[in-house]
Amino acid sequence: MVDQLEDSVIETNYDEVIDTFDDMNLKPELLRGIYAYGFERPSAIQQRAIMPILGERDVLAQAQSGTGKTATFSISVLQKIDTSLKQCQALILAPTRELAQQIQKVVVALGDLMNVECHACIGGTLVRDDMAALQAGVHVVVGTPGRVHDMIQRRALPTDAVQMFVLDEADEMLSRGFKDQIYDIFQLLPPTAQVVLLSATMPQDVLEVTTKFMRDPIRILVKKDELTLEGIKQFYVAVEKEEWKLDTLCDLYETVTVTQAVIFCNTRRKVDWLTEQLTERDFTVSSMHGDMDQAQRDTLMHEFRTGSSRILITTDLLARGIDVQQVSLVINYDLPANRENYIHRIGRGGRFGRKGVSINFVTNDDVRMMREIEQFYNTHIEEMPMNIADLI
């Protein structure tokens, strides 16, 4: 029975979608902050969750990292804050110091034009510094349950003005043993505080929190095929001519130790050619493209997943279907012919919270396409540094 609950998926009970940030009636300075941060249009979770949160409903969202969830609650928090009131109006909990600091950065960046004070309360820092910052007055506190609980107990963090309580990665927090502190914090908040809970999975202890502390929540399930470039280091190598790519690839392999890599080419012919070239040079390579039947593909994927082949060469056709945990490196031997496929190729390297590296081979003819990709995703692809080995 427990196992069934472990993986239970919530059912969405809300399907209103707002397609653009402009239609969300946000404060002009917040909207400017969103665009300045590089967001162009809301991701699936942002389209669905921001409005109900702004409507002061309790919201339960099942979403993986990389779906844009941090900005979802950050935008909502910033919209609701009264900056003329120097009191903590929103409290955000996260399982780790790193995540708490990351959330703080997003809140500060999006609220750049709003004069918002956002403080990170995390372990490993001086308690007296926390107390001083909180006493100076902040609008938003983001932190780990232990330190936040401590600050409330010491009366350094008054909770009477808290209108919104956000629990990010609730499954992680509860599995790390923060249950008692979280329950205590709930008891110390005003009964009217709105609760927003985000979790990738819905195990029993998360469902318990939702039934105990949430009032008739709006439930939103975001499928995890929304990809992101967050956490992925993107580089390019300038290779003047197509003919030089093979040597560049071999040189790269001499400098880095890679557990596994996926290499994308634009044509099946090139996949076959490159496979042949690398096999001749004693690399263990598998290749996959659309001419193969499903059984062949499954065998190859199995080989790659189990690590018996370390390099998988493939075309865009399969960009969406490769979901391999250990892939730390994606190489675009050819830049994709259309921009949309770029994220499907490299957005997987950093899944499951793993960081990834992508390296793009760029000929003189590809420079324009690379700039287009950068613009389209509002991202930056840097020239590959000499110490690339340390980054993979």
UniProtKB/Swiss-Prot annotation:
Recorded E.C. number(s)?
Answer: 3.6.4.13
Tell me which Gene3D superfamilies the record gives: P-loop containing nucleotide triphosphate hydrolases
- Which InterPro entries does this entry report, sorted A to Z? DEAD/DEAH_box_helicase_dom, EIF4A_DEADc, Helicase_ATP-bd, Helicase_C-like, P-loop_NTPase, RNA-helicase_DEAD-box_CS, RNA_helicase_DEAD_Q_motif
Chief localization class? cytoplasm
- GO terms under biological process: cytoplasmic translational initiation
Instruction: Give its localization.
Output: Cytoplasm
What role does this protein play?
ATP-dependent RNA helicase which is a subunit of the eIF4F complex involved in cap recognition and is required for mRNA binding to ribosome. In the current model of translation initiation, eIF4A unwinds RNA secondary structures in the 5'-UTR of mRNAs which is necessary to allow efficient binding of the small ribosomal subunit, and subsequent scanning for the initiator codon.
Q: What is this protein called?
A: ATP-dependent RNA helicase eIF4A
Q: Which gene encodes it?
A: tif1
